[in-house]
Amino acid sequence: MSGTTSGTTGGTTGGTVVVDVHAHAIVPEVEMVVAGAAGLEAQRALDLRRYGRESAAVNGPMIAARMRRLTDLGVRLEDMAAAGVDVQVVSPSPSQYHYWADADLARHVWRAANRGIAAIVDAEPLRFNGFGLVPLQHPDLLVEALDDAVELCGLAGVEISSYAPGPDGGRTVELSDPRLEPFWARAAELGAVVLLHPFGCSLDERLDRFYLSNTVAQPAENAVALSHLIFSGVLDRHPRLRLVAAHGGGYLPTYIGRSDHAWEVRPDAHTCAELPSSYLRRLWFDSLVHTPAALRALVAAVGADRVVLGSDAPFDMGVDDPVARLDAAGLDPADRDRIAGGTAAGLGLLPRKLQS
């Protein structure tokens, strides 16, 4: 593969198209939309409190150093070639969720994000698919935004965080919230993929040192959000829902035995139809768990047909060599190929021009 070709070669898998399902872009138009908006400075102050000054001082230069990789299509293609990746499913940086925005501004945010990602896909239609955004803080607008991403912009689905502040200071929107039922139903009806990618954590200052706001919070938020989906019965009511959890689903998949035990012994946890661990086979997870042993444990917990390749490129907490890291796990060749691209293809995440 070259950095400028519009074709794919099957990467390094002998014919399997290698698909990175977890890769980010910054959509400049989104930042133009929110610039100067009421509420932006308050949100930045909250982010500073959550991340801590030390981490915030690192984040700015880190983003600046990666800005071309986040915004320049030619550089992105070069990165993909170096990594042995044929296809990226590109999603906006989670920093562009802007869940603080009111309904009117939120509509401008998702329209800009969805069209920005669609422009990347349209520029190289054999190399990219994409996820758009929806305003999780406004449950009544989710279906409209989902339709915008999938039906109007032609994207594969949307990216959401693990929770959002409630509209107008109301109750927090968890993924178990009944107000999300129309969204889950519509996503299942469309066959749209929902990428669960946490951003932020409600523990705030407890994690404001040592970058715990990311290293601990991201996997914790994944575990909490997935638990809300499981225990509330969302997956019972919407069995066709296609949800991919970033970061390997965090802490939940390899420690779900405790959830099973609670389901068996406590009536307040016996709220879903089956053992919580059984729902791992109704979800999908990316491979970004950072060690070969952790990836093997994830595959043992959920099955290789429930794992997709993910890099979190080009951020510093991501990896530039997702295929090499997959190979380092020493999986069965068939399982390895499923993770490299076969599972993603089954989810409909190949570019539309490559789908049979």
Language model features: what each stretch is:
Residues S2-V21, P28-V87, R115-A123, E144, ...:
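Mid-to-C-terminal alpha-helical segments outside catalytic/metal-binding sites
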Residues V19-V21, Q88-V90, N129-G132, V158-I160, ...:
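Hydrophobic faces of well-ordered beta-strands that scaffold small-molecule active sites
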Residues H24, Y163, F199-G200, G249, ...:
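Catalytic metal-binding/acid-base residues of hydrolase active sites
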Residues H24-L70, S202-A220, S259-L280:
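Active-site gating loops and adjacent loop-to-helix segments of metal-dependent hydrolytic enzymes
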Residues D86-A225:
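Active-site gating/metal-coordination segments in enzymes
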Residues L155, E189, R240, G303-A304:
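Active-site acidic short loop of glycosyltransferases
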Residues A223-A225, V265-D268, S287-T291:
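A general structural motif
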Residues I230-S278:
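Aromatic-lined glycan-binding groove of carbohydrate-active enzymes
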